[in-house]
Curated annotation (Swiss-Prot):
Family: Belongs to the GnRH family.
TM ranges: none
Official protein name in the record: Progonadoliberin-1
Modified residues (Pyrrolidone carboxylic acid): 26
UniProt source species: Sparus aurata
Lineage: Eukaryota, Metazoa, Chordata, Craniata, Vertebrata
Length: 95
């Protein structure tokens, strides 16, 4: 066999071994039993808790406690922040 072909076989074997080691692991997450079976009742309870926890998602300022402000000044501030890099010109990158 040519050296290039043997390197490809070694690489393929290494990839297969790594895939097998990842596939055989038990990945633990919330509500996953050691047997690999999920408890569906607890999953639905957690989704309900997540939805109840954030009731004011429509207005993010009320959740954070900041004062409501019109959208136009906020847009201009964001545009100025994002556009400030563009006004300077092209950046010079060192090689």
């Amino acid at each position: 066999m040519a050296p290039q072909t043997s390197n490809l076989w070694i690489l393929l074997l290494l990839v297969v071994v790594m895939m097998m080691s990842q596939g055989c692991c038990q990945h633990w997450s919330y509500g996953l039993s050691p047997g690999g079976k999920r408890d569906l009742d607890s999953l639905s309870d957690t989704l309900g808790n997540i939805i109840e926890r954030f009731p004011h998602v429509d207005s993010p300022c009320s959740v954070l406690g900041c004062v409501e402000e019109p959208h136009v000044p906020r847009m201009y501030r964001m545009k100025g922040f994002i556009g400030s890099e563009r006004d300077i010109g092209h950046r010079m990158y060192k090689k």
